[in-house]
């Protein structure tokens, strides 16, 4: 149907404005369709900088909704799903201790489950699945921990356990696992006093003894000659500082040591 030829200028103005709006809407729609969906998390710049990511935190309940409780995390709100509510329930204003990580959509989420390791810590984790991208490790919480192939010293096998350190991937902003411990451990000099007690995670049976990760940060060695019984790879044990070597690694003893040993 054609427009009348005697349409006045004032009558044509709304039509031009309406057409401009249509062109604008069409342009935005086409731009959105043309752009491929991002494979990165929805909020890596913000959530990866959150001081509670990968840690325990006591957070305040802001509001209760059918999916769960929303907790205050700086300028963000983090969901604690209802399945993690304590038996006595939650109310607005309550404080609850939670662990913060990312869900499958890259959003921060909270849980009361206990992960086997926090950010910066080392633990032996079991490989649940191996895909074309990497391995997924059982971590003690609802979401498995991803270890890319680049962070595997050898290709992980499903069902096997490996020592894994937790770090934040600088691209995705997510908590990620690495089996390349030497990239993350021993990058600073220890400052222990001889005789000081430390926690040692046994990670390797060496010809001279057992190589250990000390307090999740340093390399140490427990020597066969000092041990009355063999140790088990993957076990944690209290050890004692004998000395700090020139290479920054620690010599350890399995028992408290006396003054005579410290002077040798």
What are these regions (language model features)?
Residues 2-264:
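Single-stranded RNA-binding regions, centering on S1/OB-family and related RNA-binding modules
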């Amino acid at each position: 149907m054609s427009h009348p030829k005697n349409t006045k200028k004032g009558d044509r103005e709304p039509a031009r404005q309406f057409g401009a709006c249509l062109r604008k809407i069409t342009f935005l729609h086409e731009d959105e369709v043309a752009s491929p969906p991002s494979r990165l998390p929805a909020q890596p710049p913000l959530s990866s900088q959150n001081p509670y990511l990968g840690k325990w935190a006591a957070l305040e309940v802001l509001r209760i909704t059918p999916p769960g409780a929303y907790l205050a995390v700086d300028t963000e709100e983090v969901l604690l799903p209802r399945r993690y509510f304590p038996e006595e329930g939650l109310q607005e204003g309550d404080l609850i201790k939670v662990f913060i990580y990312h869900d499958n959509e890259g959003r921060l989420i909270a849980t009361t489950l206990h992960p086997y390791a926090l950010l910066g810590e080392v633990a032996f984790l079991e490989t649940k699945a191996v895909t074309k991208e990497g391995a997924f490790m059982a971590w003690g919480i609802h979401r498995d921990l991803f270890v890319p192939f680049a962070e595997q010293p050898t290709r992980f096998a499903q069902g096997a356990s490996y020592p894994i350190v937790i770090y934040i991937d600088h691209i995705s902003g997510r908590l990620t696992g690495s089996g390349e411990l030497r990239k993350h451990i021993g990058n600073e000099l220890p400052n222990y006093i001889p005789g000081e007690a430390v926690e040692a995670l046994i990670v390797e049976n060496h010809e001279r003894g057992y190589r250990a990760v000390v307090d999740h940060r340093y390399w140490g060695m427990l020597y066969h000659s000092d041990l009355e019984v063999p140790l088990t790879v993957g076990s944690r044990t209290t050890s004692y500082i004998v000395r700090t070597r020139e290479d920054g690694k620690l010599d350890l003893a399995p028992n408290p040591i006396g003054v005579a040993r410290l002077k040798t």
